[in-house]
């Protein structure tokens, strides 16, 4: 039995969950999420708990058991609290600006980068060097933050580029020069 998969998921007040034909829909105060549940996994719902169990001990069922429980837990957390990821921009002339649902980035290239935000993602820009990506879907928040970081990842010599707020960059020593 999966250690993570056997834990029940508590349903907070204000969250409604419907499960029909392997489709799970979670509705909460911050929004709605839906996901198709993998085969080999069964979901049992009570008034305030959801439990996930597997149909057999096959490899696919065992691997999907804990994953399914975690995905459902992330859906419940997303519609109640939401998820956010913070990014920082370091470098001379590097800045971010939000215009509508387009994030304009100046990252040292000869052209500005215009990044259209996906549906369901909100971005806040503070002091043109801090970006906060918010949303209900944990996977989409993380993917959007990773795409923004990929435009110019931090380089190891001066640390210029876009990095996660809690990320530490391993710095390299520069050339030592001939004496």
Swiss-Prot record:
It holds the Pfam family Ribosomal_L6. GO terms for molecular function: rRNA binding; structural constituent of ribosome. This is Large ribosomal subunit protein uL6. It comes from the Bacteria. InterPro entries: Ribosomal_uL6-like, Ribosomal_uL6-like_a/b-dom_sf, Ribosomal_uL6_a/b-dom, Ribosomal_uL6_bac-type, Ribosomal_uL6_CS. Coiled coil: none annotated. NCBIfam families: L6_bact. PANTHER family: 60S/50S RIBOSOMAL PROTEIN L6/L9 (PTHR11655), LARGE RIBOSOMAL SUBUNIT PROTEIN UL6M (PTHR11655:SF14). GO terms for cellular component: cytosolic large ribosomal subunit. Keywords: Ribonucleoprotein, Ribosomal protein, RNA-binding, rRNA-binding. Belongs to the universal ribosomal protein uL6 family. GO terms for biological process: cytoplasmic translation. Part of the 50S ribosomal subunit. This protein binds to the 23S rRNA, and is important in its secondary structure. It is located near the subunit interface in the base of the L7/L12 stalk, and near the tRNA binding site of the peptidyltransferase center.
